């Protein structure tokens, strides 16, 4: 153990009990906690295990630096006696023994299960107890959460910091019985200074997307991405326009944006991305736009390929959804259309990635349909596009983002 690692974790059966991060949310929510994972791994000298939900979590995080085991729980509301997966989760938690837990959800449905596994309030840092601040972005909140030390580790943490020497620059945070401490020096100081999501692109991911682009004859051409759909757009026709779909923007508007991209960038390939259920919407947009250089690839994009594609794209226009956050995290410049969600708290962030955020009001309330086509065009004109990212020898590291074997 070196002075640069704050390794204060207990031992269980001779194995290191790694930090556990609990976060149940949409893809964007999970991307926004990536800096928290990085910070916890640096502070505690071990990969961070992740408890979440959704089939996309493993493709998003499996193999990413600083991530340990990934466990999924699809149905949190089921009682223990009815849920085999919850009983399996309890068994795994009991086998690993007491460990520090960062519980990032405010509903706290699984706090009793953690206590049953031996991780009571002494071991758990609860987001609800720490509390958010007005105007605080979720990335910054998660950083404060990561710097909060569970009471069970407070004494040994203070001893470790006394041995390592004083650390300045980070005020302590109080959260009931929990106390935050300044971060210990990381593997490199830049790791802790980088507060924004930064997803790695593996060599396997790079090779896959390059082969795919080569087969499509798109390798070497500027790539422009359009994400019009979200999880609600699997509905068709008038149901897309339901009041519950706060991320709907008129199809004719999207068609106008696709035509604008084609006119301004005649050498580019325009790719309509998304999940397979959003492919029908993309087909409709292509029909309305009538652009020969635009293609629907929503049926061909597993998450690792999407990330690698975004790492090569010159720019993207998107609604506020998960792929907007992954784009920012791999350095893809983007224009993001927001509905009712607060961009102050959840706008995509990615270090130096250029992000143009648009939001408009209708009858005094945020409404995505109030965003004009002209506003999107002007935002695109302001956006500094990435040049030369889709070459035959392009690597994600060339764009300033992590690449790993």
Question: How would you describe each model-predicted region?
Answer:
Residues 1-405:
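Catalytic machinery of carbohydrate-active enzymes
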């Amino acid at each position: 153990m070196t002075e640069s690692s704050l390794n204060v974790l207990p031992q269980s059966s001779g194995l290191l009990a790694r930090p556990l991060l609990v976060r149940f949310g949409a893809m964007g929510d999970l991307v926004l906690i990536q800096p928290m994972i990085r910070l916890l791994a640096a502070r505690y000298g071990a990969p961070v295990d992740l408890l979440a939900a959704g089939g996309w979590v493993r493709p998003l995080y499996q193999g990413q630096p600083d991530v340990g085991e990934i466990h999924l729980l699809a149905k949190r509301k089921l009682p223990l006696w009815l849920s085999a997966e919850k009983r399996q989760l309890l068994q795994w938690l009991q086998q690993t023994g007491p460990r520090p837990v960062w519980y990032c959800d405010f509903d706290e449905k699984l706090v009793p299960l953690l206590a049953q596994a031996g991780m009571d309030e002494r071991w758990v840092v609860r987001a609800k107890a720490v509390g958010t601040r007005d105007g605080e972005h979720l990335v910054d909140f998660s950083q404060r959460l990561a710097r909060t030390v569970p009471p069970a580790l407070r004494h040994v943490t203070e001893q470790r910091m006394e041995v390592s020497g004083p650390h300045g620059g980070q005020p302590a945070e109080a959260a009931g019985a929990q106390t935050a401490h300044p971060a210990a020096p990381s593997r490199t100081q830049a790791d802790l200074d980088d507060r924004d999501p930064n997803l790695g692109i593996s060599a396997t991911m790079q090779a896959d997307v390059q082969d795919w682009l080569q087969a499509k004859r798109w390798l070497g051409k500027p790539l422009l991405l359009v994400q019009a759909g979200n999880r609600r757009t699997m509905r068709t026709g008038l149901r897309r326009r339901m009041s519950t779909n706060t991320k709907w923007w008129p199809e004719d508007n999207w068609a106008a944006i696709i035509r604008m991209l084609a006119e301004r960038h005649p050498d580019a390939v325009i790719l309509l991305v998304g999940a397979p259920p959003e492919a029908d919407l993309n087909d409709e947009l292509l029909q309305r736009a009538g652009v020969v250089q635009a293609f629907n690839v929503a049926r061909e994009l597993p998450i690792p390929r999407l990330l690698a594609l975004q790492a090569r794209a010159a720019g993207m226009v998107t609604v506020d959804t998960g792929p907007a956050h992954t784009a920012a995290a791999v350095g893809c410049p983007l224009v993001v259309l927001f509905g009712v969600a607060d961009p102050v708290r959840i706008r995509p962030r990615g270090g130096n990635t250029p992000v143009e955020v648009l939001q408009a009001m209708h009858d005094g309330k945020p409404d995505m349909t109030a965003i004009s086509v002209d506003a999107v065009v002007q935002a695109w004109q302001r956006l500094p596009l990435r040049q030369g990212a889709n070459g035959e020898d392009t690597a994600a590291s060339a764009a300033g983002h992590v690449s790993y074997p």
